[in-house]
């Protein structure tokens, strides 16, 4: 059988739109790209399972070989929406220019699957002793639905996992989590000349912001991980809106904030800290304060520095293992087995106009993936 060339894989992945978004006008699902991956994997001898988690939202698990343990190579098939007016290249076409592949998903991260397929083609699998798994998930860019569902329901037990997010081929063994909430204060509007006839939502929010800043300082003092460039949890007040006129008592105010917890800080524990910080204000103003998550919270993630996958992958890549501050699906897959994040392209290209992958990543990525397959499947 004649298999597609590397560039053909890449072209078809990028030209197949698979945008996920909380805005229903953008949200597309990923069925078409999953079906293409399924056919390619089957052509290479893999057993393929496809699961529809929600309508149009699919996960794919491919397995090459048999036995216990092995290696799981994982990634997401969805992309973010795009602003066409800011792109100089067609987002859903693979454009070659400036020694780069341009297109939506070239770095983040549909293109990674082309590297996996190319590495599989280049290996003689005759003496394989452990399975290779390929996981392609849905909705990483929104809810991480695919990874959450897979980690909670799968029966496979690989020895190790590599997630191919763009890390410039530097192995990543940890990152912070992300929690984002909206706090809405409902006051009572009225004319500013008589404050007693109203309840000023901005004044209540001022108390809340002071409490959050106190919590921010507490997080800095009480939690520390020297493995991170910013070694403490961060809390940021990112957006606020309230009121409509200087001579009117503010009847409503809303604040959006986020927290990036270190690995080891549980989401329940963090939520309790946030609630404790506001409990006196909530008691003072009953029924006027609502806290709503802006997305499903993501825990921090850390793979032990002593794990064999850490040392062996660092040797294969010739790079020191690092930690980062952005989020991936790693916290969920780490529940299955020791997990690293490692892939071609730069995170600086993620979610940007004219997203690209430099040609200089192509040969090293195929080489690294081939070595990882030999290391953990033979």
From Swiss-Prot:
Pathway: Amino-acid biosynthesis; L-arginine biosynthesis; L-ornithine from N(2)-acetyl-L-ornithine (linear): step 1/1
Cofactor(s) demanded: Zn(2+); Co(2+); glutathione
Positions annotated to bind Zn(2+) 2: 108, 141, 351
Domain of life: Bacteria
The name this protein goes by in its record: Acetylornithine deacetylase
Known partners and oligomeric status: Homodimer.
A biological process from GO: L-arginine biosynthetic process
Function, in words: Catalyzes the hydrolysis of the amide bond of N(2)-acetylated L-amino acids. Cleaves the acetyl group from N-acetyl-L-ornithine to form L-ornithine, an intermediate in L-arginine biosynthesis pathway, and a branchpoint in the synthesis of polyamines.
InterPro entries: AcOrn-deacetyl, ArgE/DapE_CS, Bact_exopeptidase_dim_dom, Peptidase_M20, Peptidase_M20_dimer, Peptidase_M20A
Positions annotated as active site in the UniProt record: 78, 140
GO molecular function terms listed in the Swiss-Prot or TrEMBL record: acetylornithine deacetylase activity; zinc ion binding
Compartments, as annotated in UniProt: Cytoplasm
PANTHER family: ACETYLORNITHINE DEACETYLASE (PTHR43808:SF1)
Substrates-to-products reaction catalysed: N(2)-acetyl-L-ornithine + H2O = L-ornithine + acetate
UniProt keyword annotations, A-Z: Amino-acid biosynthesis, Arginine biosynthesis, Cobalt, Cytoplasm, Hydrolase, Metal-binding, Zinc
GO CC term, one of those recorded: cytoplasm
